[in-house]
């Protein structure tokens, strides 16, 4: 059984939109800490702690108040695309990205609509939070990218099923090969007469 198509993922996103937004909001508010803007190790620890419990989380990074990335991309996953994104992105202008534009106008966690990730080339959504100091001034923004298909699977409890798909394919392939062998033997026997 193959993964869902992009259209299937978008349809599922709209079905589970509120649950996805609440989940990402709770994850992002749980990691918010002033040290994330100054300490790359704290940022890495925060993401790896999140990824341990939420396997759909792809990347975490921070932006300054102007929308310029102030940290490197922090990636704890071992997916094929992760090495090309890990440790990059610092000083990139993200001021026109949807997550920044939404977060700039809000004091709460915002979640983008699905879009193709430039890092993973998969559909993703981003959650963003404007981080304020004690006086209410913006320090910057915390951005969390998640794989949309994996998030939907997590919410629907499909992660275990997906893990067994290769085993099912193998078993089905053996059955099909066995049936072809039976057909071949029968055809051989029929032509020998």
What would you call each of these model-derived segments?
Residues 45-53, 102:
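Amphipathic alpha-helical regulatory segments at dimerization interfaces
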Residues 164-193:
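Alpha-helical transmembrane segments and their helix-membrane boundary motifs
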């Amino acid at each position: 059984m193959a993964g869902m198509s992009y259209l299937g993922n978008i349809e599922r996103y709209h079905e589970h939109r509120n649950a996805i937004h609440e989940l990402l909001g709770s994850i992002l508010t749980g990691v918010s800490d002033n040290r994330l803007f100054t300490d790359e190790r704290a940022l890495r620890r925060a993401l790896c702690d999140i990824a341990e419990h939420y396997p759909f989380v792809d990347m975490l990074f921070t932006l300054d108040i102007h929308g310029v990335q102030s940290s490197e991309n922090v990636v704890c996953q071992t997916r094929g695309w992760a090495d090309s994104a890990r440790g990059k992105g610092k000083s990139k202008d993200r001021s026109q990205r949807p997550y920044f534009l939404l977060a700039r106008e809000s004091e709460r966690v915002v979640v983008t609509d699905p879009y193709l990730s430039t890092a993973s080339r998969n559909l993703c959504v981003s959650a963003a939070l404007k981080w304020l100091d004690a006086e209410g001034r913006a320090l910057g923004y915390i951005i969390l990218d998640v794989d949309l298909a994996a998030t939907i699977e997590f919410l629907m409890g499909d992660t275990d099923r997906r893990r067994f798909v290769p085993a099912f394919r193998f078993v089905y392939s053996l059955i099909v090969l066995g049936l072809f062998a039976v057909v071949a033997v029968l055809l051989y026997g029929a032509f020998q007469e």
